[in-house]
A protein has these predicted regions:
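C-terminal or mid-to-C-terminal helical accessory/interaction module adjacent to the motor/catalytic core
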Residues: 97-98, 140-227, 267-271
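Intrinsically disordered, low-complexity regulatory segments
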Residues: 1-173
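Metal- or metallocofactor-binding catalytic centers and their adjacent structured scaffolds
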Residues: 244-277, 284, 447
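Structured, non-catalytic alpha/beta "coupling" segments that mediate domain-domain communication
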Residues: 31-60, 199-244, 393-439
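Basic, low-complexity terminal or inter-domain segments flanking catalytic cores
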Residues: 2-4, 122, 178, 214, ...
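Amphipathic alpha-helical transducer elements in NTP-driven molecular machines
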Residues: 10-13, 17, 44-47, 82-89, ...
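Phosphate-interacting basic helix/loop segments used at nucleotide- and nucleic-acid interfaces
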Residues: 78-96, 102, 204-205, 286, ...
């Protein structure tokens, strides 16, 4: 028998060939592409790497003229399929003539299933009755890969249909909204993109920023004391006070005493359960919290998955399935920096396993599948460490702390001091708490502590924090915006479009103007409701409760309604956005010619700089600093050639 195995990428094909051939596979290069061949049990096997999606959807050539194509017609227009690259499809057709069966071994999720089905359609175009089977695995470890190929299943056609529906729906929403906004609001020069997930996500960032701007800080007061040697700090019971007079009255009740008397000491135990297992969104949020962008963290995780070091990194699941081989995984960590901790877990009579709120059956939560490869310290090592420590924490006992509350009295005023000590670090040994804890000295009822100070401390209520990429991902998950695989890409897109900026995310003038205008003149585009409904309907396709045609028709109907609403307010919408984006791009009069304006532009190499609007008559230019400030031009920072001919405004 001659068998073709389809992998999603070259690195995955190499790993599968290495495992299945036990290291005997040979790399073959032909007709501009590479694949792997080997023989096993009398069968000839070819492992062929795809390149992600091998079919692109786009509108016909006649629909690509933005000015001539009516947008209502565009909504109902069927996109055309284009094979890409052509050489890859030619290679597949060549294989079809000689193979007996094909095994789909792309990532097991919606996109992976669709990628495999795209290639399968090319093969069956040549050999209509070609047998196709599916190998499902959640880790590229030798054991799991071999089990998947020993027990293949039928391809999941419904899963692929759900992904195909998403392609059609996202293409239509993105094309129609982007064309409308660019033509009506972009002055013909600036691309203004919008989408059914992108725009509600932008609004989340804008609303949080607006909440912060509108926040009115209120002052409040606490009364604190320092007493004893070494000194302990205690806070007056009854606070905080919303008027300073209340705090002053309480200080007066304390009188002129010179000691704080311990009235009673209470002890209790606090148990903090271990954290839930990582799914994709919580993993990326934690990476963001610790300073790594979600997109970079996902690239590193994908690389670790392909090398067999972690499980599949795209999952909603926060509950380990019963089949998870915890002891086997812990055993693999015996030759790693986590060996001592893993061995202590193995020595326990019973492992306690935490669980999160989301349970699915596609893939398990993220976890290590092998000891880390020996490599230089870098992003992949950091991401592996993040995932491994979280996994070990989820198998660990609760953290136990002894909490002490000491009630002190000065005059007629009661104060409370709280301290804690660690009884059993539990999971915090592998995931230490970064917050410092206070420890109280040994206090007994009746102790008189020398009073050092009583003071009134004024504070102010704090506004809600700006979103970070991590908190935005978690909010998107909670509201049903996007999927585990696309959320970080949407956030990344907002940065690339220059709608948002900064680690603490702020909207740019263009981003704020766009989302504010749409919130008034096309609110359905900016709220999660419509997007969440379409996400639910695509899940219905995956589970066999709806068809691609039904859901695409629903989407088209909704998009017609949104477009009609936007058209009804096209003048107001366009004026709003144009006014705001002009002032964002304009940096004042040119100080060289006085007739032009300094505007932000982008050079051929992608550098942003300030140049005169009268270019090429006036060639005045400045560098832009990280915070947008004007800096003297420097040839060492950007070449004159790259900046010589500016492109459209950034």
């Amino acid at each position: 028998m001659r068998r073709l195995i389809l992998a999603e990428k070259f690195s995955a094909a190499r790993r599968l060939a290495q495992i299945l051939s036990e290291g005997t596979a040979e790399k073959v290069r032909a007709d501009g592409s590479s694949h792997f061949t080997f023989s096993i049990h009398g069968d000839d096997v070819i492992v062929f790497p795809l390149r992600g999606h091998v079919v692109e959807l786009d509108y016909p050539e006649a629909a690509r003229d933005w000015a001539l194509m009516d947008l209502d017609d565009l909504i109902d227009l069927e996109p055309v399929r284009e094979e890409t690259p052509v050489t890859l499809h030619d290679a597949l057709r060549g294989f079809a003539d000689t193979i007996d069966e094909v095994v789909l071994a792309t990532d097991y999720d919606r996109e992976g299933e669709l990628i495999a089905v795209e290639a399968l359609e090319t093969l069956r175009g040549r050999k209509p009755h070609l047998t196709a089977r599916r190998a499902r695995f959640s880790a590229m470890t030798p054991g799991e890969v071999r089990r998947a190929f020993e027990t293949p299943v039928e391809p999941d056609w419904a899963l692929a249909e759900a992904a195909a529906a998403r392609q059609r729906i996202d293409l239509a929403w993105g094309a129609v909204l982007t064309r409308f906004l660019t033509l009506e609001c972009g002055s013909g020069r600036q691309l203004l993109s919008a989408g059914r997930v992108q725009t509600p996500t932008l609004r989340l960032a804008a609303d949080r920023e607006r909440d912060r701007e509108d926040f009115m800080a209120r002052p409040f007061w606490n009364v604190t004391l320092l007493a004893g040697d070494p000194p302990i700090e205690a806070t007056a019971v009854g606070g905080p006070f919303w008027d300073e007079g209340g705090a002053q009255a309480l200080v007066a009740l304390a009188g002129l005493g010179d000691t704080a008397v311990v009235e009673r000491v209470e002890h209790r135990e606090r148990r903090d359960p271990p954290p839930a297992p990582f799914n994709t969104t919580s993993f990326l949020a934690q990476a963001s919290r610790q300073g790594t962008s979600p997109s970079r963290a996902m690239l590193a995780a994908q690389s670790l998955y392909v090398s067999g070091e972690i499980s599949y990194p795209r999952t909603d699941n926060t509950v380990y399935p019963p089949s998870t081989a915890f002891h086997e995984i812990l055993g693999r960590l015996a030759e790693s920096p986590y060996a001592a901790y893993a061995e202590r877990l193995l020595a326990r009579s019973e492992l306690t396993v935490s669980r999160g709120p989301i349970q699915t059956t596609d893939h398990p939560p993220l976890h290590p599948t092998a000891a880390p490869a020996k490599r230089r310290a870098g992003l992949r090592s950091w991401v592996y460490d993040l995932i491994a420590r979280r996994f070990l924490a989820t198998l660990s006992p609760a953290s136990v702390a002894a909490v002490t509350e000491a009630h002190l009295r000065v005059g007629d005023t009661e104060f409370l001091a709280v301290g804690e000590t660690t009884v059993d670090p539990g999971w915090r040994e592998i995931l230490p708490d970064e917050n410092p804890v206070s420890v109280l000295p040994d206090l007994k009822e009746g102790d008189a502590l020398p009073l050092r100070e009583i003071r009134i401390v004024e504070e102010r209520t704090k506004p809600p924090p700006l979103h970070t990429a991590g908190t935005l991902l978690l909010t998107m998950q909670r509201l049903g915006l996007g999927t585990k695989s696309t959320r970080h890409e949407i956030v990344d897109l907002l940065f690339r479009r220059q709608y948002v900026s900064g680690r603490s995310i702020r909207t740019t003038a263009a981003g704020r103007a766009l989302v504010d205008a749409l919130a008034i003149y096309g609110p359905d585009v900016t709220t999660p409701d419509m997007t969440r409904h379409l996400e639910d309907r695509m899940s219905d396709i995956a589970e066999g409760r709806a068809t691609l045609g039904e859901v695409v028709a629903e989407s088209r109907h909704a998009l017609h309604g949104v477009l009609a609403e936007l058209r009804a307010h096209r003048e107001s919408l366009g004026r709003w956005v144009r006014d705001a984006t002009f002032f964002e791009k304009d940096y004042g009069a040119c100080d060289a010619c006085a007739d032009g304006r300094l505007v932000r532009r982008k050079a051929r190499n992608g550098w942003a700089f300030l140049g005169c609007s009268r270019f090429p008559e006036c060639r005045q230019r400045y560098r832009l600093g990280a915070l947008g400030q004007r800096l003297p031009w420097s040839e060492s920072a950007a070449t004159a050639d790259a900046a010589e001919v500016p492109s459209t405004a950034a």
